[in-house]
Curated annotation (Swiss-Prot):
Family note: Belongs to the thymidylate kinase family.
Pfam family, one: Thymidylate_kin
Top-tier EC class: transferase
GO molecular function terms noted in the UniProt entry: ATP binding; dTMP kinase activity
Residues where ATP binds: 7-14
This protein's name: Thymidylate kinase
Listed EC numbers: 2.7.4.9
Gene that produces this protein: tmk
Cited function: Phosphorylation of dTMP to form dTDP in both de novo and salvage pathways of dTTP synthesis.
Catalyses which reaction(s): dTMP + ATP = dTDP + ADP
HAMAP family per the UniProt record, alphabetical: Thymidylate_kinase
Length: 206
């Protein structure tokens, strides 16, 4: 089972991933928590280069292919082996983040980026079983991030950028509602977990 958690900045992806993982471990399930970009040694090094480039200005296309390179390695090295071993894999961000951030917000084109995302996984289609979209007004999400007082380059973008991010995620969910569970990220973590467990109960039954 492959579950992806998506959402804009400050939506609580890491908190939901950990809480969901804890819930499933308590049910004696094997769980792997991971993230993108990152999730493996090469991926984490690319993450550092993308999010905090050392006095470098990455072009939009260079940045896109760094994300895709991280994903290609992550899928082959971590995600597929874990799924084969019977793990439930919970990943913070996947294809949709790339389509929304690089395709929509950065202006490279959603269809162009989606096509590249489909190719980077190889000849066999590889999509999550469930996409959990944490939706939150961009200004509230940024307020949450500002409390942390440490920002990557995307979190430093203007509010208009983050509004495009939110609209992009919602447009993807609206276009393919069977793939998504859209959650109000302002709700309590306990409420979110209840909704996720209800939504996924058939897929997660032993």
């Amino acid at each position: 089972m492959f579950i992806v958690i998506e959402g804009g900045e400050g939506s609580g992806k890491s908190s939901l991933a950990k809480a969901l993982g804890d819930q499933l471990v308590a049910q004696d399930r094997k769980v792997l928590l991971t993230r993108e970009p990152g999730g493996c040694l090469i991926g984490e090094r690319l993450r550092d280069l993308i999010l905090e480039p050392p006095h470098l200005e990455l072009s939009r296309c260079c940045e896109l292919f760094l994300f895709l390179g991280s994903r290609a390695q992550h899928i082959q090295e971590v995600i597929i082996p874990a799924l084969r071993d019977g793990y439930i894999v919970i990943c913070e961000r996947f294809h949709d983040s790339t389509i929304v951030y690089q395709g929509i917000a950065e202006g490279l084109g959603a269809d162009f980026v989606a096509d590249l995302c489909s190719k980077v996984v190889g000849p066999t289609p590889f999509l999550p079983n469930f996409v959990l979209l944490l939706d939150i007004p961009a200004d509230i999400g940024l307020q949450r991030k500002h409390r942390q007082k440490v920002f990557d380059k995307f979190e430093k973008k203007p509010l208009s950028y983050h509004n495009r991010i939110r609209e992009g995620f919602l447009s993807l969910a609206s276009a393919d509602p069977s793939r998504y569970l859209v959650l109000d990220a302002r709700e309590s973590l306990a409420s979110l977990i209840d909704k996720v467990m209800l939504h996924t109960q058939l897929g997660l039954c032993t």
